[in-house]
Amino acid sequence: MSASLPRPLVHVGVTVPDLDAAVRWYSEVLGLVVLSRGATVRAGEGYEGDAASDVFKAGFGEVRIAHLACGNGVGLELFEFVRPAVEPSREDHHHARITHLCFLAPDLEEATERVVRAGGTRVTEHSWEVIEGQPYRFSFCRDPWGNVIEFHTNSFEQIFSNQGTDSAGQQ
């Protein structure tokens, strides 16, 4: 089994209150490719409804789902829960959940301004070095629905593979 590790990340699921607007936003602002949009799945209706009921458990009624693809083939699965309806996201980041999505953007300022012009907000006041003294930079913003988006100037492997220490400075 270890011969097939590390496992590739296939997709990330994100809940939004307006699926159609989110599909437009992620495709127009971040350039993701729309693979499917707006499939409706209802509890008790067919195979998909039974599977969704098993995943989302008691209280699940209806969800709309769209699938988008990033430039490296990793998917973004967007969910708009209809029954029960989507509730606003909590702003705190210390609860167990996915904290952000990170996209490659060699021009951080251009990427951040594009998000802001399209209804998102800036989180960090400016870009920062990922590791002090090294050329790799990041910035954070939010999409119009409050989901946190990070931009990196370089790939994850470029930034972290040759550091030789963990984040606490331990060998």
Regions found by a protein language model. Give the residues of each.
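Short beta->alpha transition motifs characteristic of CBS
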Residues: 13, 152-158
